[in-house]
């Protein structure tokens, strides 16, 4: 498995408060060890069959695109409220 963030993802990550950055790093560690870790609540988005979201905290999610070679490209991170606006079902 490979994984990387887009420039937009990296900008959004850098804008997060430090406690959310720490939570995002912890979530990514779990993801890199086991993408199906129950704490991540990995979910496929109905709007795009390549798009998946993971739970960072109770109020924060991250979105990645998954490709056939098991490459993940992180495209978005933010609040659940913003997630619902950006990725309506």
List each language-model region with its residue ranges.
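Hydrophobic residues in alpha-helical membrane-spanning segments
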Residues: 18, 36-39, 63
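Tryptophan-centered motif/residue detector
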Residues: 10, 28, 52, 74-76
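Arg/Lys-rich, positively charged N-terminal/basic patches that mediate binding to nucleic acids
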Residues: 1-27
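Enriched for short, Lys/Arg-rich terminal
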Residues: 2-4, 56-89
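Non-catalytic, surface-exposed connector residues within folded enzymatic/regulatory domains
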Residues: 3, 25, 36-39, 77
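A short, surface-exposed loop/turn module that caps and links secondary-structure elements
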Residues: 29-54
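Active-site micro-motifs of SAM-dependent methyltransferase domains
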Residues: 11, 30, 82
């Amino acid at each position: 498995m490979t994984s990387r963030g887009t420039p937009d993802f990296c900008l959004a990550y850098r804008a997060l408060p430090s406690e959310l950055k720490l939570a995002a790093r912890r979530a990514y560690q779990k993801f890199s060890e086991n993408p199906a870790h129950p704490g991540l609540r990995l979910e496929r988005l109905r709007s795009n069959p390549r798009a998946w979201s993971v739970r960072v905290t109770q109020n924060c999610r991250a979105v990645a695109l998954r490709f056939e070679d098991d490459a993940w490209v992180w495209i978005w991170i933010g609040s659940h409220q913003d997630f619902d606006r950006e990725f309506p079902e």
